[in-house]
Every structure is written in structure tokens, then in C-alpha cells.
């Protein structure tokens, strides 16, 4: 099962990571055709939360340094673009270039207090497990 999870993660991250601006694009076409969705080239907070969780989970379970690299690459992107260092919380929606959409949104019908706290709690638990092994 872990091999399948690794393959799915690797395929998704390589297909969706924006090599020009960083971050994960919200939609990419599996066949390389132009996406039909309006928000296809936006970066949303929750897929980045999922990258942080899944890359750390894979690293915890396999020791694969590439997964740890993806964790830190994604964390760096999130800290630079999603996180608001002045007023806290994360912006929910970024343009492709990494700037918040306008008006900027930290909470809405679709962005509530679930994904980010869940991500942080799961990361804390996994890092505690890794520290206990060391």
C-alpha cells in the first residue's frame, strides 16, 4: 500500500507543481490539454495542507529524503505566500504568481477552521513520533 501511496504522491506533485512560480496548481489536465476550470491556475490553501501532511507521512513511513524535500519546499512556499505574518491565519486563494486574490480571503463559506488546524495537529503528531525514534 505504501508503494501505491508513494506513486500517487509522486505523480500528483510532479504533474501539478508550478515550476515557474512554485506552489501547486489547482487543476491540470491529465492529457496536457488546457484546463476548462476558471480557477485552474490558482493556488488554494487546502491542497498545500495535504502536501504537507502526505509528504511528512511518507517520510515518516519510508525515510525517503525526497518526501522530506517536498515537505520543506511546500512549507517554504506556504510561509512565503499563504501565511499572513502581520494578522495571522492563511490566505485561502492565491493567484498563480503567489499573491493573494483580491479581495483577499482568510475565511468564507468554503474556507473555515478545518484544513490548517488539522494539518498542524497531524504534523505535530508525526514530528513527535519521528523525534521519539531518534
Regions found by a protein language model. Give the residues of each.
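Glycan-recognition and catalytic cores of secretory/periplasmic carbohydrate-active enzymes
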Residues: 1-134
Amino acid at each position: 500500500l505504501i508503494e501505491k501511496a508513494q506513486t500517487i504522491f509522486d505523480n500528483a506533485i510532479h504533474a501539478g507543481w508550478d515550476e515557474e512560480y512554485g506552489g501547486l496548481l489547482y487543476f491540470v489536465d491529465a492529457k496536457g490539454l488546457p484546463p476548462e476550470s476558471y480557477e485552474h491556475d490558482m493556488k488554494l490553501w487546502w491542497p498545500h495542507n495535504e502536501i504537507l501532511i502526505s509528504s511528512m507521512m511518507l517520510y515518516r513511513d519510508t525515510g525517503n529524503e525526497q518526501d522530506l524535500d517536498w515537505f520543506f519546499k511546500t512549507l517554504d512556499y506556504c510561509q512565503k505566500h499563504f501565511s499572513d505574518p502581520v494578522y495571522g491565519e492563511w490566505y485561502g486563494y492565491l493567484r498563480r504568481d503567489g499573491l493573494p486574490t483580491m479581495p483577499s480571503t482568510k475565511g468564507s463559506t468554503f474556507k473555515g477552521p478545518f484544513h490548517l488546524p488539522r494539518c498542524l495537529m497531524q504534523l505535530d503528531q508525526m514530528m513527535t513520533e519521528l523525534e521519539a525514534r531518534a
